[in-house]
């Protein structure tokens, strides 16, 4: 189920405050956040936000196609290591 329209999108208050301060000062610095559930707003476009994936902060440059999605969608928590390829020489 999607979120109710009357509630509006969820954005962590500190993340929103930091992006608004960067917009006012016209500076471009990386914002670190653990809030993967925050929705990307149009005021965040053009900024780089480092989202925590459980191990490190992954820097994500926000573009206008990302508006409306959540930050956690772009910082993957699992890394797939490919399965070992079986060599024909080893089989024999």
Curated annotation (Swiss-Prot):
Segment forming the signal sequence: none
A single GO molecular function term of this UniProt record: structural constituent of ribosome
**SUPFAM superfamilies reported for this sequence:** Ribosomal protein S19
**One GO cellular component, as annotated:** chloroplast
Which keywords accompany this UniProt record? Chloroplast, Plastid, Ribonucleoprotein, Ribosomal protein, RNA-binding, rRNA-binding
One Pfam family, short name please? Ribosomal_S19
Where is this protein localized, as stated in its record? Plastid, Chloroplast
One GO BP on record is: translation
Protein task: Protein S19 forms a complex with S13 that binds strongly to the 16S ribosomal RNA.
Family affiliation: Belongs to the universal ribosomal protein uS19 family.
The name of this protein is Small ribosomal subunit protein uS19c
């Amino acid at each position: 189920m999607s979120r109710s329209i009357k509630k509006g999108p969820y954005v962590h208050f500190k993340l929103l405050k930091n992006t608004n301060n960067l917009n006012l000062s016209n500076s471009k610095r990386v914002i670190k956040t653990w809030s993967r559930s925050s929705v990307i707003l149009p005021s965040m476009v053009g900024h780089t936000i480092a989202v925590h994936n459980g191990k490190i902060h992954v820097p994500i440059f926000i573009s206008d196609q990302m508006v409306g999605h959540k930050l956690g969608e772009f910082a993957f928590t699992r890394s797939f290591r490919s399965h070992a390829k079986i060599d024909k020489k080893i089989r024999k």
